[in-house]
Structure formats: C-alpha cells, structure tokens
Amino acid sequence: MSERVILAYSGGLDTSVAISWIGKETGREVVAVAIDLGQGGEDMEVIRQRALDCGAVEAVVVDARDEFAEGYCLPTIRNNALYMDRYPLVSAISRPLIVKHLVAAAREHGGSIVAHGCTGKGNDQVRFEVGFASLAPDLEVLAPVRDYAWTREKAIAFAEENAIPINVTKRSPFSIDQNVWGRAVETGFLEHLWNAPTKDVYAYTEDPTLNWSTPDEVIVGFERGVPVSIDGKPVSVLGAIEELNARAGAQGVGRLDVVEDRLVGIKSREIYEAPGAMVLITAHTELEHVTLERELGRFKRHTDQRWAELVYDGLWYSPLKAALESFVDKTQEHVTGEIRMVLHGGHIAVNGRRSAESLYDFNLATYDEGDSFDQSAAKGFVYVHGLSSKIASRRDQR
C-alpha cells in the first residue's frame, strides 16, 4: 500500500489542490480530515465530498465544536487571554485541536505523514509543526504551500489544469480563517495600513450604528471561572459563545483592527471579529476584579499575558503553559457571580456586578453612615508606607 498522508483539510483552494498535487507528484494517498469548529459557511458534508472529488482516498469530518469550546475557548476566557492586549487568539487556539485530531487520524488510518496548507510567512506553520513534534514526533510533516512556494495564481492554474472541482477567483481579495470563537481577515488592500476596512470585510458583526436605538443588556453568570448562564438561563460554554456572538455581533461589538507582531519576526495587519469572545473575556475580567485578592489579581495579570504569548507562539503543549494553568485553576476557586453589561454601538459597558464571593465590603468602602473603616489607622500606615522613599530622598538631597 502507498504511504498515506493525513491532510488538514479546510475545503478551500490550497488544501484542495494539495490533495491532487500530493497524489500526482509523490504517489502517496491522501486522507483528508476536516474539523468542525463552528466556523459555519459550507455544510461539512459538502466539504467531505469535495475532498473525495479532489482525489482523497478517504475523507473524515470531526465535530469538535463542544471540545473546542470546553477545552480551548474556556481556558482563553479564564486566562483573560488577549495577545498584545487586543487579539483573543481566534486562530491560535484552534491549531492545537486540529493537530490532536490529525495525529489521531494518522494512527487510525495508517498515516506516516501529516500535512498542512500553511505558508512560510505565518504563525500557523509553527503551531502545527510544534504540535506534531510534541504529540507525534515520529510523523513526517509535509507543507507543500510553503516548501514549494505556491502562490494563489499557481494554485488556481494547477486546479484548472487538473480539473479540480473548486470554484475560485484570482480577484478574491482576502485570506479568511473562522471558527465559533471568531473570524480573522487579512491580505488584499488591508495590507496597506492606511486603508480602512470596507463593509465586505465583516461577516460576524453588524455596523455598530445599525441598532443604535436598541442597546442590549445582558447578564453573564460564572461558576469558578466558567460561564454557566446568560440572563439567568443555564448555558454550555459553546451555547454562551454562540448566543453572545449573535447578540453582541448585532451591536457591532468585537471588531478589532490590529497590527500584531508575528512569531516569524514581521508585523501583520489583521481584522478580527470576536463578539462573543470579547464579551466573555470582559465579563470574566470584571468578575475577577471583584473576587480576587489584590496581590493575586495583580500577579495573575502577568500570567494572563504570558499564557496568551505561549499560545500565540504555538507552545500549547509546553510545560510552562501546563504549570500556568495549574495556577489559574487555583485562582478560579472564588470566581463565581454575575456581571451585567450593555452592548451598544460597538462597545461593552459593564454596569453591574454581584457575587457571594465578592471581596467588596460596602461598610469599609462607603463614605456615608455605617462606615466601619478605622481612619485613625491611616496616618501610621501612610508614614510607614512612604518611609523608604523619604529616606532615599533625604540622601539624594545632600
């Protein structure tokens, strides 16, 4: 039997061409694996059949929506993960899950090679290949788009010459990646930093002015850092993301225009849409402000940033990430309560917080009757707190 290549298949141009190219140029069989991460668009059965029509000996569809939400989106929420304080890791968190299922498919279908359709300029090649090296170092990796310098024009020409059944146009301006956590758009005229995004860039969000007269107030409930309810009704993590995608998206919430530092050393402009993600991260962050002790909250802000960097850099399976998550599990013991927000005009405005685990003490905080704060203790505290600065200043003024 010929060697088998297990291909991460999206249904798009590059991976459809890859099926035919691998067969013709290397004589290997291709098993196409398409992962449903809630990306919507084409029916997954249509994508599966396209892989077969392109020459795959087998085509597998994996419904990983709940797994993605519980195992990948949820840690992103609990870590308040925003790379460069902006990007909620839309694509980055999906790659390790795809890697996991490709490795499983290789074991099941007798594959000795795994393949992806990434270019040599992006982060995803790193995420895929570091993931493969971590989970299955025995598997060979094939990256035809990168290793053979495919361009879009070359891929289209190959598709036409070999009657590959896929509808494409050389004028299609954008590169798009999407899943239930969000949508990423790049290339085309967006590569010129002064060009503003046009309406056709967006699909998950409405124009922020469209529903200007009808703001949406929403209450998100958490238990130990896990979103469990919306407006008092129980939801799964996936259900929370999907509902907030719809509601926040209708208010234009979650649009991000970002110039980010890629792992490969270049800067790249990306347009992201992540309405549900931004609402959940905002709500979770706010609940931590209420329930985490000051020093713990201050330190966790550092680990949140480091976790986001590790995931962005393709180190999902790293020991440091695993250690940080053990720390975060401990921090979430008291992150239980509800956050109320108004979604309006592209913005998220928090206007209410309640938690049985709150560290906010009304009697200590109030300036009105009932104040229990012992203000007589403040004078000595201020003296001791500023003593080291006072001594240093006295020395410097000699």
From Swiss-Prot:
Organism in which the protein naturally occurs: Mycobacterium avium (strain 104)
Binding site for L-aspartate: 119, 123-124
Organism placement in taxonomy: Bacteria, Bacillati, Actinomycetota, Actinomycetes, Mycobacteriales
Assigned GO CC terms: cytoplasm
Family from the record: Belongs to the argininosuccinate synthase family. Type 1 subfamily.
HAMAP family, A to Z: Arg_succ_synth_type1
Compartment annotation: Cytoplasm
The protein's Enzyme Commission number: 6.3.4.5
Chain's gene name: argG
UniProt-recorded name of the protein: Argininosuccinate synthase
Single Gene Ontology BP annotation: L-arginine biosynthetic process
NCBIfam families according to UniProt: argG (TIGR00032), PRK00509.1 (NF001770)
Reactions catalysed, as given in the entry: L-citrulline + L-aspartate + ATP = 2-(N(omega)-L-arginino)succinate + AMP + diphosphate + H(+)
Subunit description: Homotetramer.
